[in-house]
UniProtKB/Swiss-Prot annotation:
<feature type="binding site">
    <location>
        <position position="60"/>
    </location>
    <ligand>
        <name>substrate</name>
    </ligand>
</feature>
<dbReference type="GO" id="GO:0008652">
    <property type="term" value="P:amino acid biosynthetic process"/>
</dbReference>
<feature type="binding site">
    <location>
        <position position="140"/>
    </location>
    <ligand>
        <name>substrate</name>
    </ligand>
</feature>
<dbReference type="GO" id="GO:0000287">
    <property type="term" value="F:magnesium ion binding"/>
</dbReference>
<feature type="binding site">
    <location>
        <position position="82"/>
    </location>
    <ligand>
        <name>substrate</name>
    </ligand>
</feature>
<keyword id="KW-0057">Aromatic amino acid biosynthesis</keyword>
<dbReference type="GO" id="GO:0009423">
    <property type="term" value="P:chorismate biosynthetic process"/>
</dbReference>
<keyword id="KW-0028">Amino-acid biosynthesis</keyword>
<dbReference type="Pfam" id="PF01202">
    <property type="entry name" value="SKI"/>
</dbReference>
<feature type="binding site">
    <location>
        <position position="120"/>
    </location>
    <ligand>
        <name>ATP</name>
    </ligand>
</feature>
<dbReference type="GO" id="GO:0009073">
    <property type="term" value="P:aromatic amino acid family biosynthetic process"/>
</dbReference>
<keyword id="KW-0479">Metal-binding</keyword>
<feature type="binding site">
    <location>
        <position position="36"/>
    </location>
    <ligand>
        <name>substrate</name>
    </ligand>
</feature>
<keyword id="KW-0067">ATP-binding</keyword>
<dbReference type="GO" id="GO:0005524">
    <property type="term" value="F:ATP binding"/>
</dbReference>
<dbReference type="InterPro" id="IPR000623">
    <property type="entry name" value="Shikimate_kinase/TSH1"/>
</dbReference>
<keyword id="KW-0547">Nucleotide-binding</keyword>
Length: 175
């Protein structure tokens, strides 16, 4: 089997994908790309605005195009949005074109990490954000597990420690 050179980070919002991804890219001297940031740059608008104007469907279409394009690059660490796995096409591209790492976290930790963040459209203007996170986990966690080459809980470790663990696990995967 040819060695997979890309590393794709998946998992729920607040799992640390972007923070860990930056550390990982630095350790491996690879480019770091965040699919949500890429969508915002190309749209010239933030994700909340895209959700407001185009709805979640419009956002997901943009996300599919971006993930298809980004996963064709070589030597990148890609942090995906929490809902990227909802698309079968995204799951196929991610699992076929790189090492998929599922950064797992508890709903409680997610809630702590996201409660002051105003850039999470699915958590805005809802009565019970914790319940929304629970509902999302029920749908998305099995999809994360379906395509993950490696699963790592992120609740207790710093981003730097997590990035180092990922490097070791990838070395073992290909050792």
């Amino acid at each position: 089997m040819a060695e997979k050179r890309n590393i794709f980070l998946i998992g729920p919002m607040g799992a640390g994908k972007s923070t860990i991804g930056r550390q990982l890219a630095q350790l491996l001297s690879m480019d770091f790309v965040d699919s949500d940031n890429e969508i915002e740059q190309r749209a010239g608008a933030d994700i909340s605005w895209i959700f407001d104007v185009e709805g979640e469907d419009g956002f997901r279409k943009r996300e599919e195009r971006i993930i298809n394009e980004l996963t064709q690059r070589q030597g990148i660490v890609l942090s995906t949005g929490g809902g990227a796995v909802l698309s079968k096409e995204n799951r196929n591209h991610l699992s076929a074109r790189g090492i998929v790492i599922y950064l797992e976290t508890t709903v409680e930790k997610q809630y702590q990490r996201t409660q002051r963040d105003k850039k999470r459209p699915l958590l805005q203007e809802v009565e019970d954000p914790r319940q929304v996170l629970e509902d999302l986990a029920k749908i998305r966690n099995p999809l994360y597990e379906e395509i993950a080459d490696i699963t790592l809980p992120t609740d207790e470790q710093s981003a730097k420690v997590m990035a180092t663990q990922i490097v070791d696990l990838i070395d073992n995967l290909h050792g």
